[in-house]
UniProtKB/Swiss-Prot annotation:
Record keywords: Nucleotide-binding
One Pfam assignment: DUF520
PANTHER family assigned: UPF0234 PROTEIN YAJQ (PTHR30476:SF0)
InterPro entries assigned: DUF520 (IPR007551), UPF0234-like_C (IPR035571), UPF0234_N (IPR035570), YajQ-like_sf (IPR036183)
MF-aspect GO terms: nucleotide binding
Name under which the protein is recorded: Nucleotide-binding protein Clos_1967
């Protein structure tokens, strides 16, 4: 009797790489002519990045710098959820960016229905913040991975524990 093969679908971010990207962004902000001395900050608290800038234009510039540094570090921009730009006293602008960790129930259901509707001979089951896909044939598992990579899902997916 053949043993089932499986893999897990997860959505995780390496927070150390996020910290490195934030440090690189802060260094570039302190050295750039248009941002030097503007008291612009980029900070991470747990799963949120907060950006403080003197005005909207500088805030957008800082977001562009941060996005560039994150992509250079291998962090997908799909893992970022941008909050509204808030205006404080003195015309300062602040934006909070949430880092998406894990797959929520709604997205997990979409992934499982996408796999089931594809008629690939695999089973998908939701396990907390991940989705386990199992099947008899490794080629079917590879087809499921390819299907999910081609589907433009609004989150960053990694495929782990391929057995």
């Amino acid at each position: 009797m053949a043993k089932d093969n499986s893999f897990d679908i997860v959505s995780q971010i390496d927070l150390q790489e996020v910290d490195n990207a934030i440090n690189q962004s802060s260094k570039e902000i302190s050295q750039r002519f248009d941002l030097k001395g503007t008291n612009t900050t980029v900070e991470r608290n747990d799963t949120e990045i907060s950006i403080n800038a003197p005005d909207d234009m500088k805030l957008k510039n800082v977001v562009d710098i941060l996005q560039t540094k994150l992509t250079q570090r291998g962090i997908s921009l799909k893992a970022l959820e941008y909050g509204k730009i808030e205006h404080a006293l003195g015309g300062r602008a602040k934006q909070v960016i949430k880092l998406q960790q894990g797959i929520d129930k709604d997205q997990a259901k979409k992934i499982t229905t996408l796999i089931k509707d594809s008629k690939i001979k695999v089973q998908a089951s939701i396990q907390g913040e991940s989705v386990r896909v199992s099947g008899k044939n490794r080629d079917d598992l590879q087809a499921a991975i390819q299907l999910l990579k081609e589907a433009d899902l609004p989150m960053n997916l990694q495929f782990t524990n391929y057995r």
